[in-house]
Amino acid sequence: MRSRLAALLGLGALAGSVHADAVERLARTPEAFKAAVRASGPGDSVVLANGVWRDFEIVFTGEGTAAQPITLRAQTPGKVVISGKSNLRLAGRHLIVSGLTFKDGFSPSSEVIAFRQDAALAFDSRVTETVIDGFNKPGRAAEDYWIGLYGQNNRVDHNHLQGKLNSGVTLAVVLSSPESQQNHHRIDHNYFGPRPPLGSNGGETIRVGTSPFSRTRSLTVIEDNYFEGCSGEVEIVSNKSGGNIYRRNVFVRSQGALVLRHGEDNLVEDNVFLGGGLAGTGGVRVINARQTVRDNYFQGLRGDGFAAALALMNGVPNSPLNRYDQVLDARIENNIFVNVTAVVFGAGADQERTLPPARSRLSGNVFLGAGDKALFKAMAPIDGLTFTGNVVDGVAPLEGVAGFHASAIGRETLADGRVYPDAAARKTLGLKEPVKLLAREETGVAWYPKGDPTIAFERAAPARVTIPVGKLDLSEAGHAGAALEIVDQRK
């Protein structure tokens, strides 16, 4: 009996140790890759050989564990280029993808990287240190996502994404099934490089949810990302779900705003918005209920209206899902605004959007400018807003409204170029110490160069175009991202 029990225990130990020693399988062809994926279990790695993999539709599936994930990686990070008509789909649990470069091609499907394979989703999985550069469909109006996040508990981190020219969100969190809701995804330390103006909706860099699922909680964390020259449209980040956190992100010379478009109970904190004096650069736009915007820093933003440094929108009575819920119970606290163009209350007020912000509070914010310029714009009644402890210097207070105090504030310029109230002023005002500015080099990958958006992607000056009578042809009028000023000589 004892010998039989010992034999059974021995078999159990052997079964439990099948993948105790991780196996690396080097694949040099698509066929070898498929075989390697089929053979891999917890702890194993599938390694793509260095070189160009053209017209390669990658399907990476498996069931790893938290302690022993299954990994797909480049033999050498940056030396494996996925080109032509190619994409990547991953599905299963505890999968990791690392070190790939997508360039010189486009996806034949609706995503370049998808955390799903048909109906099968990815959970507890990660895409890291991967590059997508200019991987655009041939037609500008042809739509795709570069990364589609499905499932739950996935992470997208330390990736480099730049040069999207065609329609579609760069990174979309999709909530179209219960298995992808309340997902607890984490999106962090990514470099979102230049994206020129698309000229229409569909040019967001990040979108979390969509209108039909906007009452759903996503619970996604977007933190420590670097957005540079992300000017695809006025919504750089489009939040369309609830319970999300946007924290310690940096926006540099990006023409648009972080927009709480739909969804409730979202938090925007410790982010930095640096406009560099570029037209159209914005901060945060607030819509819906119970949004919190605190401890953020805004400097040199030249946007107005929907792209103001701060905009609280008017809402639509009995709003359908795809319009604008009223701003209710918002908390705008302890933010610092330096040399920005506009702060707008009741943005978008018109015959449809008739509900001004209500039951909302702006407290402890600091507004620094020069020459007592007019900064605040009330486009609708503001009696639903409470202002307490806000300080202005070099900015005209909101006329006839209590809760703004004009005071000379000592200033200092930090080593990173930000202008802050100095230490004495911070102590007097009860401000916390400046948050360390996330460095560009801390995001993305170390082995792929980051471009210069001020040269390649800065919005062009308007091109004057003459319209011949009866014909309009703009095909030769400008380059991608150009702003066109149309002159009709018939008038």
Regions flagged by a language model, labelled:
Residues 7-15:
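Bacterial N-terminal signal peptides
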Residues 24-31, 45-56, 60-112, 132-136:
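Right-handed parallel beta-helix/beta-spiral solenoid domain characteristic of secreted/periplasmic
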Residues 33-37:
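Short, conserved alpha-helix that lines the donor NDP-sugar binding/gating region
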Residues 16-20:
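Sec/Tat signal peptide C-region and signal peptidase I cleavage site
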Residues 398-491:
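Surface beta-loop-beta hairpin patches that serve as ligand-binding interfaces in beta-rich domains
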Residues 54-59, 84-91, 103-127, 132-416, ...:
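Glycine- and acidic/polar-rich repeat regions and solenoidal domains
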Residues 1-7:
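Bacterial N-terminal signal peptides that target proteins for export
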